[in-house]
């Protein structure tokens, strides 16, 4: 009986829940300062993120911490989640990327929805943008906007007002 209890304790010692205190994103591998559920502080824990994805969570987010070989001196954070900001109501199979400001990209069953939360959306470092579809625009369309260009509306007014 004692052997089973010992094994149980050892297995439970391999994984833990924690609360994020701070994150340092200055190095190649992000590090996280956490407080384990029992109040045990751990500083500089490596956060192993999936290739191609990175995020810097807010203080108060939750983390899952692994202790390889049960060695509590060398922990790794394998996931960080923040239920305060998680999008709700996704349908089965839908996927979203989101932040604490309400910005999101959601792959829905009807199509892709980009929500800029009232902020500018900027596309960078591309020679052109190509849209192989009809465009429906509810706001103004302006060309050469950084050098005093003109709007489509202004061009229409000039064209419609032209007489021969």
Predicted regions and their residues:
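Exposed beta-strand/loop interface patches that mediate assembly or binding
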Residues: 1-109
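Hydrophobic alpha-helical segments used as single-pass signal-anchor/transmembrane membrane anchors
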Residues: 159-163
């Amino acid at each position: 009986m004692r052997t089973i209890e010992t094994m149980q304790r050892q297995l439970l010692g391999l994984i833990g829940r924690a609360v994020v205190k701070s994150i340092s994103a200055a190095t190649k591998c992000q590090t996280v300062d956490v407080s384990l559920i029992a109040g045990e502080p751990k500083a500089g824990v490596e956060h192993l993120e999936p290739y191609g994805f990175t995020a810097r969570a807010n203080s108060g987010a939750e983390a899952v911490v692994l202790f390889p070989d049960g060695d509590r001196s060398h922990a790794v954070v394998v996931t960080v989640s923040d239920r305060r900001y998680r999008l709700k109501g996704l349908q089965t199979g839908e996927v979203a990327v989101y932040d604490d400001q309400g910005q999101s990209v959601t792959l829905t069953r009807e199509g892709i929805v980009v929500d800029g939360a009232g902020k500018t959306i900027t596309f960078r470092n591309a020679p052109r943008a190509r849209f192989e579809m009809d465009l429906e625009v509810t706001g103004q369309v302006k060309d050469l906007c950084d050098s005093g260009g003109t709007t489509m509306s202004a061009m229409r007014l000039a064209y419609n007002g032209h007489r021969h």
